């Protein structure tokens, strides 16, 4: 029990001495207790405890004395800032009691005090250093509970019954704490020895010269030094854990950067947490700062617009970048070099005495800045190019399906269908980007069509001028043809031949034909059914410039001749391409009489293609009907208007019989094919007008001449030469 009491008294004395604050009355009982209890303790543990308590007591008193001297110096030097001394006292009170009574703190105080006395202008630097050390060894809140419990039991230390009641618990606590402290001391000593060994090895490696041949060697001196420094840092962190102190050494790069750049404390706190985030030393970019600002605004419902958030993030990124650059620059200045450069002083710089060296250093600095800018700009361009490439790939991925769906041929624009309508019907869930692209494509197509129409109008105007010149030059040929036809007839006095001869002459406007529409239809239909295409040999003969063979109608009745003459005298205002061929000679408003197909186009026999007859002026005819240029172009660009080449028809009589020369179309269906309706025509560039290299005008070109030539009310004259090849005209004129 005595040993237990002595152990308890010694432990209480040690704890009281460790937790005691500097004062005149408190050290008296603590100093008296070990003197009274020391003889009674005969065990080695008690003797070692008394010696350790005496050492702690000595360091504690000396540390208090040095700290008071430092405070007095601060009072005299920092009269303008009276808050410095209370701040130091507060830091000293928060520090751990074991550290305050240690030799380490004594060495730090003596060094700081001596430097502050020798260099008073750097007093705040040494104050900051001392505050950093005290903060690193500050006691935790959970550790403050033990001293409070012991101090609360101090008044009961004089009463023996209370000591007897607390003996078992205190004995167990001291028995469990004693081996733990001894084990931690061994670990601390071993780690300190390893640290000293690493420091000596690092110094030895720093003193060695680095050869250029060792740069590629994995075991070169600078790589070994870097590995040892990493191990040294890990050992130092482990040592701080065992000593229960902070690992902050006051390095500039490890200091926390406060940020107050915006008006919103929540945003400032989020940015400060970002730049002071533990872990790898990464420099935040603009995207990181912008995300932090957006998160803070969304979490705290700041209600800031997007533009203001972007401006705030830009300002914060600039300020943070400047602060981090300054921090890294100062850290490089403070930690650059090694123990070999510790003796360097600014006044002994060799560049001050050697101007060549100073100039070379300035040139190297300028070159370094230029190369740094080049590297930064190079990788900035790579980053921009990568972002642009990603955007293009994303656009291609989004617009890929839309381009494939737009491949089918476009329907007619007149019928209300187009690329937009098809896209909306085929894929109703198309995105806005796809519709925008389709709108752009449609606008481009419309512009192309307008340009093509303008070009066609220009070419049509030129062709009209050529046609006028060609018509003037062919008037003589026209007169010769009329004379040949008149001479070829033997003056037959039958009633059927007189209308045929009269139609080739100039007709008076007052003449009329008293035929009903029903009779005309019955007369036209047999002739249409009896029409047959020619043999291919006639086509070859025509291509070689020879006169085509004549088909002799041996058994032609007078009724059929009358049918033929009446068909030739019909007005040429049909919706087919015949009206487009001869419309510049005459235009009438009366609807012609031809067989009507399903699509509304007129089917006309091959005899109506010939222009050898001048049409009559009907009695009930109205003013001439004019069509617009666009409608004529659409009608003239149909399959018949582009493919059919009209031939001259000559009527002769041989041996008292009428001989009829029929045209030879390129295909049997050319004269019977219906004309496409203008409302269903595809208005695309592929259906443009086809012009010939010869002087043979196309039907669409001939259809536009009446716009510049007003209709003649009196006499109409048909020119056969304008509806055939110039070569054939020459052949026919030479046949006489």
Swiss-Prot record:
Residues 1-55, 148-185, 387-558, 602-736 are annotated as: Disordered. There is a cross-link at residues 626-627 (Glycyl lysine isopeptide (Lys-Gly) (interchain with G-Cter in SUMO1)). It is found in: Cytoplasm; Nucleus, Nucleoplasm; Nucleus, PML body; Nucleus, Nucleolus. GO terms for molecular function: histone binding; nuclear androgen receptor binding; protein homodimerization activity; RNA polymerase II-specific DNA-binding transcription factor binding; transcription coactivator activity; transcription corepressor activity. Keywords: Acetylation, Apoptosis, Centromere, Chaperone, Chromatin regulator, Chromosome, Coiled coil, Cytoplasm, Isopeptide bond, Nucleus, Phosphoprotein, Repressor, Transcription, Transcription regulation, Ubl conjugation. There is a cross-link at residue 142 (Glycyl lysine isopeptide (Lys-Gly) (interchain with G-Cter in SUMO2)). Residues 646-656 have a biased composition (Basic and acidic residues). Residues 347-566 are annotated as: Necessary for interaction with USP7. Residues 1-160 are annotated as: Necessary for interaction with USP7 and ATRX. A motif (Nuclear localization signal) lies at residues 391-395, 624-630. Residues 149-179, 495-504, 513-524 have a biased composition (Polar residues). Sumoylated with SUMO1 on multiple lysine residues. Polyubiquitinated; which is promoted by CUL3 and SPOP and results in proteasomal degradation. Ubiquitinated by MDM2; inducing its degradation. Deubiquitinated by USP7; leading to stabilize it. Residues 180-216, 430-490 form a coiled coil. Residues 622-736 are annotated as: Interaction with SPOP. Residues 183-417 are annotated as: Interaction with histone H3.3. The modification Phosphoserine is found at residues 25, 213, 412, 424, 494, 497, 557, 576, 664, 667, 684, 698, 733, 735. Residues 435-485, 547-557 have a biased composition (Acidic residues). GO terms for cellular component: chromosome, centromeric region; cytosol; nucleolus; nucleus; PML body. Residues 28-55, 525-538, 669-679, 697-707 have a biased composition (Low complexity). The keyword Cytoplasm applies. The Sumo interaction motif mediates Sumo binding, and is required both for sumoylation and binding to sumoylated targets. Transcription corepressor known to repress transcriptional potential of several sumoylated transcription factors. Down-regulates basal and activated transcription. Its transcription repressor activity is modulated by recruiting it to subnuclear compartments like the nucleolus or PML/POD/ND10 nuclear bodies through interactions with MCSR1 and PML, respectively. Seems to regulate transcription in PML/POD/ND10 nuclear bodies together with PML and may influence TNFRSF6-dependent apoptosis thereby. Inhibits transcriptional activation of PAX3 and ETS1 through direct protein-protein interactions. This is Death domain-associated protein 6. It comes from Chlorocebus aethiops (Green monkey).
């Amino acid at each position: 029990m005595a040993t237990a009491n002595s152990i308890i008294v010694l432990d209480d004395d040690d704890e009281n001495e460790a937790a005691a604050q500097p004062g005149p009355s408190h050290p008296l009982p603590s100093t008296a207790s070990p003197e009274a209890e020391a003889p009674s303790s005969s065990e080695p543990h008690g003797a070692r405890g008394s010696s350790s308590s005496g050492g702690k007591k000595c360091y504690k008193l000396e540390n208090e004395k040095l700290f008071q001297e430092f405070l007095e110096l601060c009072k005299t030097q920092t009269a303008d800032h009276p808050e410095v001394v209370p701040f130091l006292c507060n830091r000293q009170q928060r520090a751990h009691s074991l550290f305050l009574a240690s030799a380490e703190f004594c060495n730090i105080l003596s060094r700081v005090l001596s430097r502050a006395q020798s260099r008073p202008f750097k007093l705040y630097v040494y104050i900051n250093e001392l505050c950093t050390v005290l903060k690193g060894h500050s006691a935790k809140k959970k550790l403050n509970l033990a001293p409070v419990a012991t101090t609360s039991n101090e008044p009961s230390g004089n009463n023996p019954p209370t000591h007897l009641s607390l003996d078992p618990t205190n004995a167990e606590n001291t028995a469990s704490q004693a081996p733990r402290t001894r084990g931690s001391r061994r670990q601390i000593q071993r780690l300190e020895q390893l640290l000293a060994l690493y420091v000596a090895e690092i110094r030895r490696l720093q003193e060695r010269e680095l050869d250029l041949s060792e740069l590629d060697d994995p075991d070169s001196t600078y790589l070994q030094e870097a590995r040892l420094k990493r191990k040294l840092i890990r050992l130092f962190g482990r040592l701080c854990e065992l000593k229960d102190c902070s690992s902050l050494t006051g390095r500039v790069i490890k200091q926390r950067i406060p940020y107050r750049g915006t008006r919103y404390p929540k945003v400032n706190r989020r940015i400060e947490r970002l730049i002071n985030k533990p872990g790898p030393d990464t420099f935040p970019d603009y995207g990181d700062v912008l995300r932090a600002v957006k998160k803070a605004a969304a979490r705290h419902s700041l209600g800031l617009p997007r533009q203001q958030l972007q401006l705030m993030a830009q300002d914060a990124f600039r300020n943070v970048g400047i602060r981090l650059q300054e921090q890294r620059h100062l850290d490089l200045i403070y930690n650059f070099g090694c123990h070999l450069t510790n003796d360097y002083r600014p006044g002994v710089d060799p560049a001050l005495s050697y101007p060549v060296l100073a100039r070379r250093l300035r040139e190297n600095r300028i070159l370094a800045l230029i190369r740094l800018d080049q590297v930064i700009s190079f990788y900035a361009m790579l980053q921009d190019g990568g972002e642009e490439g990603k955007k293009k790939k994303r656009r291609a991925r989004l617009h890929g399906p839309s381009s494939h769906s737009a491949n089918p041929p476009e329907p007619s624009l007149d019928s209300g269908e187009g690329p937009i309508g098809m896209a909306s019907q085929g894929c109703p869930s198309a995105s806005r980007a796809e519709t925008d692209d389709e709108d752009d494509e449609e606008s481009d197509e419309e512009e192309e069509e307008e340009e093509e129409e303008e070009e066609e109008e220009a070419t049509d105007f030129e062709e009209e001028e050529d046609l006028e010149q060609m018509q003037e030059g062919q008037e003589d040929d026209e007169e010769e043809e009329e004379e040949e036809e008149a001479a070829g007839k033997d003056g037959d006095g039958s009633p059927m031949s007189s209308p045929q001869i009269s139609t080739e002459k100039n007709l008076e406007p007052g003449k009329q034909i008293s035929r009903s529409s029903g009779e005309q239809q019955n007369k036209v239909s047999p002739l249409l059914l009896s029409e047959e295409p020619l043999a291919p040999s006639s086509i070859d003969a025509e291509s070689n410039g020879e006169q085509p063979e004549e088909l002799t109608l041996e058994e032609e009745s007078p009724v059929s001749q009358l049918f033929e003459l009446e068909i030739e005298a019909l007005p040429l205002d049909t919706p087919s391409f015949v009206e487009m061929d001869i419309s510049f000679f005459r235009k009438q408003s009366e609807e012609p009489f031809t067989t009507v197909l399903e699509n509304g186009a007129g089917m006309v026999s091959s005899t109506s293609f010939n222009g050898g007859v001048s049409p009559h002026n009907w009695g009930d005819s109205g003013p001439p009907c004019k069509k617009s240029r666009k409608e004529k172009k659409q009608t003239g660009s149909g399959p018949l208007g582009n493919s059919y080449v009209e031939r001259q028809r000559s009527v002769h009589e041989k041996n008292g019989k009428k001989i009829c020369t029929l045209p030879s179309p390129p295909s049997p269906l050319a004269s019977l094919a219906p004309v496409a309706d203008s409302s269903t025509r595809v208005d695309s560039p592929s259906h443009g007008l086809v012009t010939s290299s010869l002087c043979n005008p196309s039907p669409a070109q001939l259809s536009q001449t009446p716009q510049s030539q007003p209709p003649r009310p009196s006499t109409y004259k048909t020119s056969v030469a304008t509806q055939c090849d110039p070569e054939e005209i020459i052949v026919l004129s030479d046949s006489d």
